[in-house]
Amino acid sequence: MIKHTLLMPFFFSALPAYAGLTSITTGYDFTDYSGDHGNRNLAYAELVAKVENATLLFNLSQGRRDYETEHFNATRGQGAVWYKWNNWLTTRTGIAFADNTPVFARQDFRQDINLALLPKTLFTTGYRYTKYYDDVEVDAWQGGVSLYTGPVITSYRYTHYDSSDAAGSYSNMISVRLKDPRGAGYTQLWLSRGTGAYTYDWTPETRYGSMKSVSLQRIQPLTEQINLGLTAGKVWYKTPNHNFNGLQLGLHLKWQL
């Protein structure tokens, strides 16, 4: 606990002195797996700041994974930079490090490129490298498109994964976001389906087979500066040994500054 407390001053001091803080978010996520697959708890704090053409994100998370008689705790720090190069090119660079446990990926690096080449259309491509507990490494390449039609944003993304000790795998994800007629609130739905090398958990069985998931999120403004986020979802795993599922619940508060 002392180590985690000492990380907080560094977390806040990581912002450049000239950066303009735009939001602070705190949240909690919980996943309960069926059968004897345990559960996962995650609490986090997040800062977003604006520096000229760049948007900076800093996130500090504390997680716990319980599985039968095994219990794991870990801390993760991550950062990301969105940079708007011009009216049609935006990039996102992200990096994260965590304790060497099954709770989080030990190392995570991603680079995304967003191209606004057509009106009301955004193309995305990118690469992600992830190193998990027990030195499992995954390379991922993704491409997708988002369409903006009035209050609705519809997105599709395809991702191909290469794992260091499992066959290649893939995922397809569709999301639909509906903005409220007035205010900053919105509701978003995610649907995904794919094979399992990228769904790494600390048990090797989750690296094989297939999965599908559904998630629904509601962002509800409470005041002009505070938004409440509520998320509920479910994921189904089909592995060579047996099938199981996970129920996901999340809550966060975001202060706009």
Predicted regions located by residue number:
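Outer-membrane beta-barrel translocator/channel fold
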Residues: 29-44, 59-80, 94-112, 116-249
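Residue-level recognition of beta-strand termini and adjacent short loop/turns
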Residues: 52, 84-86, 90, 118, ...
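Short beta-strand-to-coil "C-cap" segments at the C-terminal boundary of structured domains/repeats
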Residues: 177-178, 253-257
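Beta-strand-dominated lipid-handling architectures at cellular/organellar boundaries
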Residues: 20-25, 38-40, 244, 254
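Transmembrane beta-strand segments of Gram-negative outer membrane beta-barrel proteins
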Residues: 18-30, 49-58, 91, 187-190
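Short linear interaction motif-like sites in intrinsically disordered regions of transcription factors
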Residues: 83-89, 203, 256
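Short, exposed beta-strand/loop patches in secreted or surface proteins that constitute
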Residues: 47-49, 81-82
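Cleavable N-terminal export/targeting peptides
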Residues: 1-23, 52-55, 88, 257
